[in-house]
Amino acid sequence: MKFAKDDLKLEEALKKEWIITNGIGGYGASTILGANTRKYHGLLVAPLIPPAKRTLILSKLDESIEIDGRKHDLFTNIGKNYISQGYKYQQSFIKEYMPIFAYKVEDTEITKVVCMEYSKNTVGVLYKIRNGKSKAKLILAPIMNYRDVHGINKNHTFNLTQIQKGRKIEVKIDDGKPIYMNISAGNYIEHNNDTFFNMFYIEEEKRGFEPEENHAVPGRYEIEIEPNEEKEISFICSLEENIEELDVRTIITKEIVRYGEMFIKTELINNRKENKSEAEIERDKLIKSFLIAGDNFIIQRPLFNTYSIIAGYPWFLDWMRDTLIAFEGLLLIPKKYEIAKKVLETCVRDIKFGLIPNGYSEGDDRPLYNSVDASLLLFEQVKKYLEYTKDYKFIKEEMYGKLESIIINYKEGIDLDDNNIYMDTDGLIVSGTENTQNTWMDAKYAGIAVTPRNGKAVEINALWYNALKIMAELSTDNKEKAKEYEKLALRCKSAFEIKFYNKKRKCLYDVLGDSKIRPNQLFALSLTYPVLDPNSPVAKEMFETVTKKLLNSYGLKTLAKGEENYVEVYEGDGFRRDFSYHQGITWTWLLGLYYNSLKKLATNTKNKTERTQYENRLKEFVQDVTKTFSKEINERGCIGSIAEIYDSKKPYLPKGAIAQAWSVAEVFRIIMEK
């Protein structure tokens, strides 16, 4: 993933971003020019209570180089009416394990590597200078803040206190925690009430948010470089106090070793040193890119002593719905089985009245129970976990009772947080109210549901049937229980087949009474136990309707073109974006449902000719997804990851969260099709 000078033209380069993470919810992110275009950008965004209370600490490190008294600014900053010119000195940007920037000024070459220490709120920047024939001076100015990641700081002055102990600087901004900086060379010059005014975030303006922000500039570093000298400078900024002995080279080495061990453990990389074909080399590069992308979302939850999965950067925390959909691609395929077990423990840790939390609040880690599907998705991933690990002991001892409580409560009724979940007399699950958004299509604006899906939703009942069948399978040592689960499953299936088929539109109702064509109907075919017989005409008819109306290269549209309120471009202020979120915009993770469904047809169709056709379509689909996203992960949006959503018309621009767990996980799962 290398961008040469010709690839760094301002307008296009500002649309390309990068991200690195620290395994506890913190991250560093910006554009490939180092210009911050979002309030979420920064070299150190640190969770004060991991993974929550994320706080912007170090926005940027602005570099200048002085050669024979001539000062050249290497940084690129954006104001409302200006863009500084540092990008003109940039020669390249590379992103593999971490971002690498290269600059050239006269005959002096500068390389910068940005990294994060794993499981610590620490960012490191390593500079390598190859000086030319003149004496030079590198000047580094930390642009700092201390505010909530979702906020903006309009302070004109900052209450700064600084303590210098050797090369270590302790900075306090307003009432924030101490921030520690350390550098391997040079002198620190303290500034007096220096403020960076009106940094302009062009992406926030597009999103309808306040685009201008002020930052504190506590001081600057000056490092002398002799003629023809080669010098390495290590800069660290951290919320961890003991950083005196830490150097950036060590952080980089540890991260590369950690990734290397991960690659070996997955057994997905061809480790043969010689005689590898060009195709094998490219395949291995692609797998490594996805493994690194996926690893960014896996986090420790120290207070729980467990692990979880961040739904998406830069603004989401861990959501159990997203975690469970990403579970196989991020944890099981890469053989991260112990972490997978810890993630399942996280899911059920705060189960209440048969509901697992959909997530936790940013401020106080309070469990939020706004989901009808997360608890049912758990069954599918327990089944997958068993297929990969055969760890029946853990499931029986730690999970079975929790799964049983989900079935009991869904059957008898759950009023918690207005979820209004219960099993109707026909065996189908009802959930929600007009303004309860508890399915994945959960957009709300000003308290009003944009896509109300209360009642009997298609995917909820497909998941309910699947959960009952899996519980019957897990209850083989109790024949009466197993029999009861099978009986409930049959009742659900019978009602589903009669009530959800929309003969007129050759598909399934999205919610009973709602004939809009949406992708949720694929759940009826894509799970371990599909509620629709894959060999049935209804299943095949539904699949063809979805293919024709919703599928494109980057995912599935959330609503068919021609339906009322259809939107195909995600843009504008909060209202416009929330309104369009599930009204035609393309979601990449839905490719996983489509893939599962096509696979069911390819393996269960009894007619040999027809089955061969599905097999060929499956092969072609996997090839198309691989081709599209091997390019996407390397060239557009967040380099080295995949976006949350895409526009539904060419050029299918990436939108939403710049890096989304279930997008990465589901595409990776498809790419790894044997």
Question: What does each of the following model-derived ranges do?
Answer:
Residues 1-674:
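Acidic, mature catalytic/reactive cores of soluble proteins
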